[in-house]
Amino acid sequence: MIKVYGDIMLDRWIVGKARRISPEAPVPVLKEIEQQFCPGGAGNLAVNIANLNGEIGVYGSIASDKEGYRVIECFSNFKKINFRASLDSKKTTTKNRLVGQGGQHICRWDREEKYTGEDAFNRLLSELSENDVVCISDYAKGTVREGTIQRLLDRNCKILVDPKQNVDFYKGAYLVKPNLREFKNWFGKFSKEK
């Protein structure tokens, strides 16, 4: 089975029309039309795998706040996802976006606190089976920490990582997939001519 572990978030879009500039500051005034919610971070990875017809478990941490319950509600729409997140006292990480009707992003603000517990990882370890693949989605919010990779390697798992931290942090993983900015930070700029 595929297990996704990492920083679970809520993605929220407030979609509206921006037809004028505020008299209080040079910013657009957005008239809200609708709000949209979906799992973000490790939750987004879980949804993408489920949409490929994969059956998966998702592990991480959310809070028992309204955003955390919204994440649970979002996952209830996916029958192939076994939502195994732990509840924590921290705030559920939420990425809020103000978006005009044409898709133009006007603003984004984040609400977050670092996760400091071990419950999510201990639950993952207790439910690992032989031949499980663990996909780690690390946004450096505290879920993935020093020793995470080694403890999974000790359980003979294949580990695939979407990283945020230094490359050495993921030593031993089967696959580490940085984005271009992370790659350049780790190894420097590269030339197409070489």
Predicted segments with their positions:
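Divalent-cation-assisted or electrostatically stabilized phosphate/pyrophosphate-binding catalytic cores
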Residues: P26-I33
